[in-house]
């Protein structure tokens, strides 16, 4: 097997094309490809471009809605709730972070909740960006199915890292 090195832009474009071919909308494919390429660039290979084949298969199988458009509500002054509408997580993350960025100057703290999303990947990268750029504390939550059993139990109860 040979290895080929791609630029960030080329890797991002290749991933976006694979997602588009599998049923993702243009914006969702672009945002997802960017996030996956960025995870690899930041050394988080487990949540990087290696996810493209699985995401593409899940799009083709209808497990995730490629044309979903996230909706945003503000349940309180310092919080944002995003419904990903069973779509890819990254458009929802982008929507939540954009809202949070516009609100953080007013309260110093913003919580972003994302529900009904696909795999949120390296969510912490986006939360770190918001905190660094705004000079404020930032936290994000997303749902996750039970996959981890508490100590001493054989029954899964906790999700996998749903807080960033």
Feature map (PLM): residue ranges:
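Generic N-terminal amphipathic, Lys/Arg-enriched alpha-helix
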Residues: 1-22
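N-terminal amphipathic, basic helical "cap/leader" segment at the start of enzyme domains
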Residues: 38-47, 51
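Glycine-rich phosphate/diphosphate-binding loops that line cofactor/substrate pockets in enzymes
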Residues: 26-27, 101-106
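Active-site cofactor/substrate anionic-group-binding motifs, chiefly glycine-
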Residues: 48-101
């Amino acid at each position: 097997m040979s290895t080929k090195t791609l630029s960030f832009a080329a890797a991002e474009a290749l991933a976006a094309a694979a997602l588009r071919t599998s049923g993702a909308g243009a914006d969702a494919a672009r945002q997802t490809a960017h996030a996956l390429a960025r995870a690899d660039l930041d050394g988080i290979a487990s949540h990087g471009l290696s996810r493209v084949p699985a995401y593409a298969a899940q799009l083709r199988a209808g497990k995730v809605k490629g044309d979903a458009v996230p909706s945003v509500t503000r349940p309180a002054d310092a919080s944002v709730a995003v419904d990903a509408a069973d779509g890819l997580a990254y458009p929802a993350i982008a929507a939540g972070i954009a809202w949070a960025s516009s609100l953080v100057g007013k309260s110093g703290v913003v919580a972003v909740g994302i529900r009904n999303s696909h795999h949120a990947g390296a969510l912490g990268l986006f939360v770190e960006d918001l905190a660094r750029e705004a000079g404020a504390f930032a936290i994000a939550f997303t749902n996750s199915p039970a996959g981890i059993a508490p100590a001493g139990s054989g029954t899964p109860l906790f999700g996998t890292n749903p807080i960033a």
